[in-house]
């Protein structure tokens, strides 16, 4: 058996986004000391998930610590295990965005870990995602903090627990990228935390001989760097509103509006249909334990189909989106 918690969760990155006015002028006019980095001996443009870590010791908690961060395709940045940035905002290679943020509030005196996960969807990336190749970049705003700059001093590894899930269950023009399959047996746990042992990880390798280059200075690295003009997207917790259908399980009346433990016996298959009641953009978060070799599958859809949209002659009718009885869900999936 395993326990499972399900909700839609967004986290607010408020209070530390800095914007272009906090960028050292030297970084707008000169080549950076930080290099784009990669995991050695991994494909440059194929699908892949990569982890990067840097451990530093600080004599005291800083009052300010501004950094500029980017990745290709995208990254999540963690400070001492806390997610602090998600980016970069999409653009093209002639205007490749970097995010500017003050990470001082997440640092402490003594040991600190800066960590990032970077993913490249390769040939199955969304149509709107321009890409040069897989890479990660972090540049300290002040030269006194250049120990943070990405270089071959960073540790790295490939995360092999991920794979893309193609398609949305029926034939249609779909170019929004793949779903995500995760094998938790292969997953690296707590890799972004201070206590994680990365002694067996490789040192990163620099991409090319030059540091990153701001737009107008050169395009040696392949990305012409510009400061993002958009603040980080607002992210805040948002739970699902109601359960519309369920099979194989009697759900507590408090679920899903209130965080509730669900115990699912071994060798049992259950399903339930969650309805938010309004359009939302969100990242689902699941908390679960036990259930070795169990499978969890999530399917997302704006509305249900009146019949399974899987063959010739099907009209893909949806009807009233508030009606669910006798209908079929088909859409993008994670598992």
Named regions from a protein language model:
Residues 1-25:
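Bacterial Sec-dependent N-terminal signal peptides
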Residues 22-335:
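Extracellular/oxidizing-compartment recognition motifs
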